[in-house]
Amino acid sequence: MEPAMEPETLEARINRATNPLNKELDWASINGFCEQLNEDFEGPPLATRLLAHKIQSPQEWEAIQALTVLETCMKSCGKRFHDEVGKFRFLNELIKVVSPKYLGSRTSEKVKNKILELLYSWTVGLPEEVKIAEAYQMLKKQGIVKSDPKLPDDTTFPLPPPRPKNVIFEDEEKSKMLARLLKSSHPEDLRAANKLIKEMVQEDQKRMEKISKRVNAIEEVNNNVKLLTEMVMSHSQGGAAAGSSEDLMKELYQRCERMRPTLFRLASDTEDNDEALAEILQANDNLTQVINLYKQLVRGEEVNGDATAGSIPGSTSALLDLSGLDLPPAGTTYPAMPTRPGEQASPEQPSASVSLLDDELMSLGLSDPTPPSGPSLDGTGWNSFQSSDATEPPAPALAQAPSMESRPPAQTSLPASSGLDDLDLLGKTLLQQSLPPESQQVRWEKQQPTPRLTLRDLQNKSSSCSSPSSSATSLLHTVSPEPPRPPQQPVPTELSLASITVPLESIKPSNILPVTVYDQHGFRILFHFARDPLPGRSDVLVVVVSMLSTAPQPIRNIVFQSAVPKVMKVKLQPPSGTELPAFNPIVHPSAITQVLLLANPQKEKVRLRYKLTFTMGDQTYNEMGDVDQFPPPETWGSL
């Protein structure tokens, strides 16, 4: 008896479909590749990696065949594959082939024209994939695309078949199985179809019960929050509170505390519905704020080291001016920050970690890097990676530097939406619940040996200082391409990010949906944007980095670093921890939070590159990526 043949791998199919010895296109292999791509759970990410390698082949015929496979898959493989192609990771590989900086000078015109034709067709046919449109527009700005190519008639994307309106039949696998069973004439198949229909109806009933439970829970939370807020504010304004009112406030407070785990369970059950998650997390934010408000104003307790009513709506003075902690630990291997003029720069690690995204996709709308004003460790137009273990140059050195003429803001703007598919909002649940322990809370009155102005004083003095847009520019390690103007008034030392620390409990989240920065191996990192700006520093965006784990193993030695172009500045405050326990669905999960400050005086479009290292089990991971889904800089003062 012959052994059963093992199914072919995607790699074997792509090798056969793009074989340079093929006399013509092997449509059987191409279609087989597309079909298996759809069937495999990890098909789309693996397929894009294989295709990127084949497209960069020095043999024209092999590259053309690979592009044909890519085009066929885009037309027949659906949204999962579209999402992978629409990521900068894959688009960057296509840009390499057409860019003269990389492989463009060695690539035939036929291959380059085919790539540009595909990019343009996807821009027209898939408008929801905004990153593809961004990449294509960047190529036009760089002059690589002179004019839009003329598309053949068969290039237009066919409209996808409408999904069944009945939610019960939205599970494609079960729908196909049900259709097959119903077509059968065997009694066993008909009984199986009947059983399957009952299961699908029961699943739909459970789904409706979850929706009803979620709606009722959110409504109850909102009502309790509204009532408790009104009573606490009335109490804080000197209103005479009767004993019954105090009892009612206490009862509402206890009810709000009991709703916290309920909201978390709802968020865990609503992972695939972004709008529902946003409602749950907004309700949780409101719940946390009113609980802290009650503790501060009614009980007079300190909330994470802050006895002031920093959560009162409308208060903008809760962000204290705290000096940073930042001394590099012994043995650190991360790139050091740029040094002051006259000091010896520490050797930097090889620049292999800076990928083509720095020059291409991460530099959309930016001109070539401008020469730095002092010795720089990074020649790519980017600041070195910053972490909470790195420190900025001392502020007095900055005060001696003359202000430089700021160049005009870039004309590019952030896309209106980068797609809810890139968002995972679960971590925001723990934004207010996972604050740093008191041992890591920095208090300005205990830390600073010498007097230092607070941000409230800075706000009062802002009229006598130079405007933020011009004075903050001199904090950046860059100069304008034009000759500097004569020295002007020195930059106030308190404008340095080194002297600013924002307590996590004083941050109020904005209505902007969080951005998923990293989501692999059961480890998620999200960016939450603060609602209120720093007093006197509308050029600074406050971001809360939230890290949480659904991995079955504990995660240790977590280090998150960030870097921005030299026209900006970034600072990471110490994280609330460096370890996350193994996920337990019964126990309330913990999270790590870290405050990130981003200065952007010239209001350029933000492009942030991150480096993440962590250990899971016996394996150490070193991850890098980029984030560009930031609010437009013009809106930072009123998010």
From Swiss-Prot:
Changing G239S: In a breast cancer sample; somatic mutation. Changing L572E: Abolishes interaction with CCDC91. Residues 481-490 have a biased composition (Pro residues). It is found in: Golgi apparatus, trans-Golgi network membrane; Endosome membrane; Early endosome membrane. Changing N194A: Abolishes interaction with ARF1 and RABEP1. Changing D358A: Increased interaction with IGF2R. PROSITE patterns: GAE (PS50180), GAT (PS50909), VHS (PS50179). SUPFAM superfamilies: Clathrin adaptor appendage domain (SSF49348), ENTH/VHS domain (SSF48464), GAT-like domain (SSF89009). Residues 171-299 form the GAT domain. One of its GO terms (biological process) is protein localization. Residues 510-631 form the GAE domain. Changing S355A: Increased interaction with IGF2R. Reduced phosphorylation. No effect on the interaction with SORL1. Changing N92A: Abolishes interaction with IGF2R. Residues 462-480 have a biased composition (Low complexity). Coiled coil: none annotated. Its main location: Golgi. Monomer. Interacts with GGA2 and GGA3. Binds to clathrin and activated ARFs, including ARF1, ARF5 and ARF6. Interacts with RABEP1. Interacts with RABGEF1. Interacts with the type-I membrane proteins LRP3, M6PR/CD-MPR and IGF2R/CI-MPR. Interacts (via N-terminal VHS domain) with SORL1/sorLA and SORT1 (via C-terminal cytosolic domain). Interacts with EPN4. Interacts with CCDC91. Interacts with HEATR5B/p200a. Interacts with SYNRG/gamma-synergin. Interacts (via GAE doamin) with NECAP1 and NECAP2. Interacts (via GAE domain) with AFTPH/aftiphilin. Interacts with TSG101 and UBC. Interacts with RNF11. Plays a role in protein sorting and trafficking between the trans-Golgi network (TGN) and endosomes. Mediates the ARF-dependent recruitment of clathrin to the TGN and binds ubiquitinated proteins and membrane cargo molecules with a cytosolic acidic cluster-dileucine (DXXLL) motif. Mediates export of the GPCR receptor ADRA2B to the cell surface. Required for targeting PKD1:PKD2 complex from the trans-Golgi network to the cilium membrane. Regulates retrograde transport of proteins such as phosphorylated form of BACE1 from endosomes to the trans-Golgi network. This is ADP-ribosylation factor-binding protein GGA1. It comes from Homo sapiens.
